[in-house]
Amino acid sequence: MLFRLWVFVLLTPCYSWRPWTISDESHCKNGNSENPIVRPGFITFNFYTKNDTRIYQVPKCLLGSDITYHLFDAINTTESLTNYEKRVTRFYEPPMNDILRLSTVPAVKQFNLDHSIQPQIVYSLNLYPSHGIYYIRVVEVRQMQYDNVSCKLPNSLNELIFPVQVRCAKITRYAGENIYTHFFTPDFMILYIQNPAGDLTMMYGNTTDINFKAPYRKSSFIFKQTLTDDLLLIVEKDVVDEEYRFISDATFVDETLDDVDEVEALLLKFNNLGIQTLLRGDCKKPDYAGIPQMMFLYGIVHFSYSTKNTGPMPVLRVLKTHENLLSIDSFVNRCVNVSEGTIQYPKMKEFLKYEPSDYSYITKNKSIPVSTLLTYLATAYETNVTISRYKWSDIANTLQKIYEKHMFFTNLTFSDRETLFMLAEIANFIPADERMQRHMQLLIGNLCNPVEIVSWAHMLTADKAPNLENIYSPCASPVRRDVTNSFVKTVLTYASLDRYRSDMMEMLSVYRPPDMARVAAIQCLSPSEPAASLPLPNVTFVISPSYVIKGVSLTITTTIVATSIIITAIPLNSTCVSTNYKYAGQDLLVLRNISSQTCEFCQSVVMEYDDIDGPLQYIYIKNIDELKTLTDPNNNLLVPNTRTHYLLLAKNGSVFEMSEVGIDIDQVSIILVIIYVLIAIIALFGLYRLIRLC
């Protein structure tokens, strides 16, 4: 019965429409008693075209339902035959050859658990122990959050398909004049691109419930197929070659669909595409022709992530995969502005409840920064999340270990960069105690130095391709805006690597946050100011070529005329005030002696600068051991000369010049020296008396 209704609705536009009335009487006009045109309980429709007349009869009960009114609202019964014929030929019809793409067998390892294993419920998540490893069924935590109301699909589809009642998640992004909107449902994904030259709709997934209006047929829009899913392409044929050239060369689409069921392979593809986009300098360019491809792959990644590979998987692997997913979210959000909507996986939020005492469910490897990983997952949620003090303590220890490992100018590893990327995202986006925020920004920013810049340049040419996380450099820290194009050029020119400067500056522009809202003392600083900020526990130092902020300032006088260094100290809890003049001044003090006992200069920063090139690097000193290592002449870490100088920016806001005398730390305190001298004098006096007695 429903089939007959569909036939009627589909054929209505074909044969035009005539007014109709419902009658319970039988009429035999143009018929006979054995074949009546109208019968009780039925509605007769007469369609006329030239000399041809077609008659359809539909039970009246069907036309009185809500769905009938819904369907009639979706069709234009007054359209002329001329307009109807014109729009039939308007759309691009993909070639029939090479439509079928047989998905390869996923290479991802499939984990099969013994069905007799009983789950352990940990914070509402079912975990399955097997051979010392805990597993979780992916389907339990990868469910995308869909809106509670029915999704309103793109208006451009109204002409072609009947309305679809389905819940979805929706996110919209802008790139110049183009608008990119993703619709995610449990069965299919839609990428809708609004372009002044012509729109494009790409629909992928199980399209069984998508019904096209006459004269269109679904088969006319199928661009590619797998064994289970369709990729429909809806675009006017006049704009395909002009705006969407990747459609003509379907290699990109084919390669994507080859791995459509393998989430980790798709994540790898997107990482490679993202790195290429960065290295070409195309990120944030509204006219970049590759954005439609990026948006298509992005949609496929999220759709496959939320619907494929639903079986058991080790908990750590689930978390690491989600980490990778969030990193591509972060990258896309940086490249293409988000205007509306989010994509969230609410069940993943349950992992945020795990404390260090629960980490054995995730991994027994103590070297994995689990607290950092879990807190990084929290950056996906718009609402404030609460991170326990135990996690913050663990995060601080992780950062401190990385800093101590590389504070004296050693190369960061891929693993270190990945962890620093997560730590930087946490520092930039997760609310925390201000002291913690300041400390994280300080340590991450201080890992940027000339050695890191050269190492980063070499990494871009390494055989092992980086991903969107481990390509991160601490030079992208918001407190290191002094890492400018001219500074990078100076460093790379010395190393004969200046050809990579544009790539590095592009990456810095993408990964560096637009402001410093998390550190109140410097939140008023303009992002365009080439300043370095050092948020110490009790004071913040800003090093800049001009006056940029209210505080106690000091001008370095040893530099050449073309190089200006102004150091401004801002006391803790001071209101940030942007200024272009000197507010208050202080003198440069000379450091003559450093005690190794009381460590007056711990929690301070040693700054190296060049008379010509300006500030070069900063080293935060936490304890006396680090200070001894730094100033030990045998380590050659501080090598003053006629051009290179060192300043100590103290925790109380004072600035000291570290002379050659001051670089050598006294290994004993002055009091002990006095005691030793007194003992020696007494001993000599006793020896003298003894000799006299003899």
Curated annotation (Swiss-Prot):
It is a single-pass type I membrane protein. Residues 1-16 form the signal peptide. It holds the Pfam family Herpes_glycop_H. The keyword Transmembrane helix applies. One of its GO terms (biological process) is symbiont entry into host cell. InterPro entries: Herpes_gH, Herpes_glycoH_C, Herpes_glycoH_C_sf. One of its GO terms (cellular component) is viral envelope. Glycans are attached at residues 51, 76, 148, 206, 337, 365, 384, 411, 538, 573, 593, 652. Keywords: Fusion of virus membrane with host cell membrane, Fusion of virus membrane with host membrane, Glycoprotein, Host cell membrane, Host endosome, Host membrane, Membrane, Sialic acid, Signal, Transmembrane, Transmembrane helix, Viral envelope protein, Viral penetration into host cytoplasm, Virion, Virus entry into host cell. The chain crosses the membrane at residues 672-692. HAMAP family: HSV_GH. The heterodimer glycoprotein H-glycoprotein L is required for the fusion of viral and plasma membranes leading to virus entry into the host cell. Following initial binding to host receptor, membrane fusion is mediated by the fusion machinery composed of gB and the heterodimer gH/gL. May also be involved in the fusion between the virion envelope and the outer nuclear membrane during virion morphogenesis. This is Envelope glycoprotein H. It comes from Human herpesvirus 6B (strain Z29).
